[in-house]
Amino acid sequence: MKLSCLLLTLAIIFVLTIVHAPNVEAKALADPESDAVGFADAVGEADPIDWKKVDWKKVSKKTCKVMLKACKFLG
C-alpha cells in the first residue's frame, strides 16, 4: 500500500514536470531516396514560476486529496 502511494506520488511529480516544461518541437525532413535531415526547435513558452508567490498550503492540500483518492482507488 505504502509503496503504491509512493509510486503514485513520483508519477504525479513526473507528470507535473512534463506539464510545466517548455514546449519542444522536433521535425524530420526526408526525400524518398535520400538520407533524413532532422532539426529540433526548443521554444520556452512556459511562464517562469515565482516560488515566493506559490501558496504551498493550497498545493499540499490538493496533492493530499489526489493521493488519498488514488490510494483508496488502488487499495
From Swiss-Prot:
Coiled coil: none annotated. The modification Leucine amide is found at L74. Pfam families: Pilosulin. Expressed by the venom gland. It is found in: Secreted. GO terms for cellular component: extracellular region. Residues 27-48 form a propeptide. Keywords: Allergen, Amidation, Antibiotic, Antimicrobial, Cytolysis, Disulfide bond, Hemolysis, Secreted, Signal, Toxin. Belongs to the formicidae venom precursor-01 superfamily. Ant pilosulin family. Dekan et al., 2017 and Nixon et al., 2020 report synthesis and functional analysis of heterodimers with different disulfide patterns as well as different A and B chain monomeric forms. This is M-myrmeciitoxin-Mp2a.
